[in-house]
Amino acid sequence: MGLIMAKLFQSWWIGKKYKIIVVGLDNAGKTTILYNYVTKDQVETKPTIGSNVEEVSYRNLDFVIWDIGGQESLRKSWSTYYVQTDVVIVVIDSSDTTRIPIMKEQLHNMLQHEDLARAHILVLANKQDLPGAMNPAEVSTQLGLQTLRGARKWQINGCCAVKGEGLPEALEWIANNL
């Protein structure tokens, strides 16, 4: 009984830490997005081997954000991060149209996992500043996001991670939907 009361007190008084995982194919901009939230500035990144984790506070909410490596050899391990996830941020390189079908398959397989049944989905159509980048509506169609309607809360936003454009709106959507 004491443990239950301690947990209730901690979540009410101290506040819950919401778990967010950031997934996407390699070179989509996941790490750039994570560190933009942490430093509010552009940082130089290198391919993530395994994961990066940081805590970010926004509007009196505390997020633990896991940036998970997107190389093909690492994608099978994504499911080890799903437990108790509140939000999944899916980062898409909107300028790399040839790899959208790969991410579509990854996304739809991922969403069948029982640990993500209650997780909200935020798709960030990154690299909107690059020539030939698909807009968010085109990315949504290519990923088949319309099939998610009614099943769970989801949103797609355009962004440019290196400039920080669209990232505050993404956090705002998360904060408003938790």
Swiss-Prot record:
GTP binds at residues 24-31, 67-71, 126-129. This is ADP-ribosylation factor-like protein 5. Belongs to the small GTPase superfamily. Arf family. GO terms for molecular function: GTP binding; GTPase activity. A lipid is attached at residue 2 (N-myristoyl glycine). It is found in: Golgi apparatus. GO terms for cellular component: cytoplasm; trans-Golgi network. NCBIfam families: small_GTP (TIGR00231). Its main location: Golgi. InterPro entries: P-loop_NTPase, Small_GTP-bd, Small_GTPase_ARF, Small_GTPase_ARF/SAR. Transmembrane segments: none annotated. PANTHER family: ADP RIBOSYLATION FACTOR-RELATED. Disruption phenotype: RNAi-mediated knockdown results in disrupted clearance of intracellular pathogen N.parisii from intestinal cells. Keywords: ER-Golgi transport, Golgi apparatus, GTP-binding, Lipoprotein, Myristate, Nucleotide-binding, Protein transport, Transport. GTP-binding protein that may be involved in protein trafficking; may modulate vesicle budding and uncoating within the Golgi apparatus. Plays a role in the shedding of pathogen spores from intestinal cells. SMART domains: ARF, SAR. GO terms for biological process: intracellular protein transport; microtubule cytoskeleton organization; protein localization to Golgi membrane; vesicle-mediated transport.
